[in-house]
């Protein structure tokens, strides 16, 4: 399917691996020019080269999105390089796990900075450019915890719900400017983050990591862990004109894990 993204410019954060990379790959396959950022410079530039092999232009910016001014710098560098900005995919790493009593105020602040405020700052920097051209796509990668809290991830559950509220509010404010805003909420996908959480669970439960992964699969109605590319495909669709009537929603990519109706 040709999604009509050739000539569009997409900025994707935390894109050197995992879900961010999967989003960047799908956008590149559809012909979009990319700006990607991540903290690890070596992995970032390796990803840049591989994405360029898919045919489009790729700007790589080694940045930590939590550092002051980096979200704005990332957007500025993207617009400076390409002269426009059409799509922003806001993606960051997951928060520290643990029950409520183990988290300090600083833990909550750190999670809010990384998982909520980076989304706020990327959107704030991007929206004026999108308004100017009368078209834009804001896509926030969060977690199914924005729909259904995950045990042991209380700081993340709190921040992810905030991003869902941000996106819904932006969808209402920006709808007359041709800008859509949506959340993509992954469940268990084949990423380093999933294996890290499985490793922590295995230690607490006294089982192996492989056994923890099998238990995780059994909790998913489809009885398997998803592929990052399956999320990337949805993001590419939401970034396209074909998704022009979809805004203000949160879509789970979770194999049916979330049991709620909404």
Language-model segments: residues:
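Residue(s) in the substrate-gating loop at a strand-loop-helix junction
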Residues: 143
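Conserved glycine-rich cofactor-binding loop
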Residues: 9, 14-17
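Alpha-helical segment proximal to the catalytic Tyr-Lys
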Residues: 128, 172-173, 244
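Substrate-binding pocket helix/loop in short-chain dehydrogenase/reductase
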Residues: 71, 99-100, 104-112, 138, ...
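Active-site helix of classical SDR
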Residues: 123, 159, 167
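Short C-terminal tail/terminal secondary-structure segment
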Residues: 148, 236, 247-262
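Short, small/polar-rich loop/turn modules that mediate ligand/substrate recognition or access, typified
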Residues: 89, 175, 180, 246-248
């Amino acid at each position: 399917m040709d999604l009509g993204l050739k000539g569009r410019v997409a900025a994707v954060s935390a894109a050197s691996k995992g879900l961010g990379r999967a989003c960047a790959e799908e956008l590149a396959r559809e012909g979009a020019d990319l700006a990607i950022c991540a903290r690890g410079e070596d992995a970032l530039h390796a990803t840049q080269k591989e994405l360029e092999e898919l045919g489009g232009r790729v700007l790589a910016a080694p940045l930590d999105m939590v550092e002051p001014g980096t979200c704005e710098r990332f957007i500025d560098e993207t617009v400076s390089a390409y002269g426009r900005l059409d799509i922003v995919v806001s993606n960051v790493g997951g928060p520290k796990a643990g029950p409520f009593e183990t988290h300090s105020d600083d833990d909550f602040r750190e999670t809010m900075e990384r998982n909520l405020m980076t989304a706020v700052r990327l959107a704030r920097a991007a929206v004026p450019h999108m308004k100017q051209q009368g078209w834009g796509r804001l896509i926030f990668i969060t977690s199914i915890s924005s729909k259904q809290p995950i045990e042991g991830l209380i700081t993340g559950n709190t921040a992810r719900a905030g991003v869902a509220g941000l996106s819904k509010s932006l969808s209402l404010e920006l709808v007359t400017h041709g800008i859509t805003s949506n959340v993509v909420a992954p469940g268990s996908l084949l990423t380093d983050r999933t294996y890290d959480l499985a490793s922590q669970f295995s230690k607490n439960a006294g089982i192996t990591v492989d056994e923890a992964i099998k238990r995780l699969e059994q909790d998913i109605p489809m009885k398997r862990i998803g592929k990052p590319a399956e999320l990337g495909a949805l993001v590419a669709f939401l970034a396209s004109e074909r998704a022009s009537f979809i805004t203000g929603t949160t879509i789970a990519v979770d194999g049916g894990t979330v049991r709620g109706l909404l």
